Curated annotation (Swiss-Prot):
Signal peptide segment: 1-26
Protein name: Apolipoprotein C-I
Source organism: Phoca vitulina (Harbor seal)
Subcellular location as annotated: Secreted
Function: Inhibitor of lipoprotein binding to the low density lipoprotein (LDL) receptor, LDL receptor-related protein, and very low density lipoprotein (VLDL) receptor. Associates with high density lipoproteins (HDL) and the triacylglycerol-rich lipoproteins in the plasma and makes up about 10% of the protein of the VLDL and 2% of that of HDL. Appears to interfere directly with fatty acid uptake and is also the major plasma inhibitor of cholesteryl ester transfer protein (CETP). Binds free fatty acids and reduces their intracellular esterification.
Lineage, opening ranks: Eukaryota, Metazoa, Chordata, Craniata, Vertebrata
UniProt entry keywords in alphabetical sequence: Lipid transport, Secreted, Signal, Transport, VLDL
A UniProt-annotated Pfam family: ApoC-I
GO molecular function: fatty acid binding; phospholipase inhibitor activity
InterPro entries membership: ApoC-1_sf, ApoC-I
Statement: the UniProt record of this protein carries the keyword Secreted: yes
Encoding gene, per UniProt annotation: APOC1
UniProt entry tagged with the keyword Secreted: yes
Length: 88
């Protein structure tokens, strides 16, 4: 009795395996994949450009660059004065 049940199941499984993947599961063709690469690169470049522009605008509107520039200028002037007094 088990052989009679196992044989139809085996036939169905074998038929499914030999049929291959369904069309929706089939791997895309190489040519279509390679054809989409320039579009994907352009999209990536545009996204990167937008994010970079937003970051630069954010830094321009921030007061951190001005404070940093002032701190470096003040520190440089202090060091310069100390060197002047030390070697004079």
């Amino acid at each position: 009795m088990r052989l009679f049940l196992s044989l139809p199941v085996l036939v169905v499984v074998l038929a499914m395996v030999l049929e291959g993947p369904a069309p929706t599961q089939a791997a895309p063709e190489i040519s279509s994949t390679l054809g989409r690469i320039p579009d994907k690169l352009k999209e990536f470049g545009n996204t990167l450009e937008d994010k970079a522009r937003a970051a630069i605008e954010s830094m321009k509107q921030s007061d951190i660059p001005a404070k940093t520039r002032n701190w470096f200028s003040e520190t440089f002037n202090k060091v310069k004065e100390q060197l002047k007094t030390a070697f004079s």
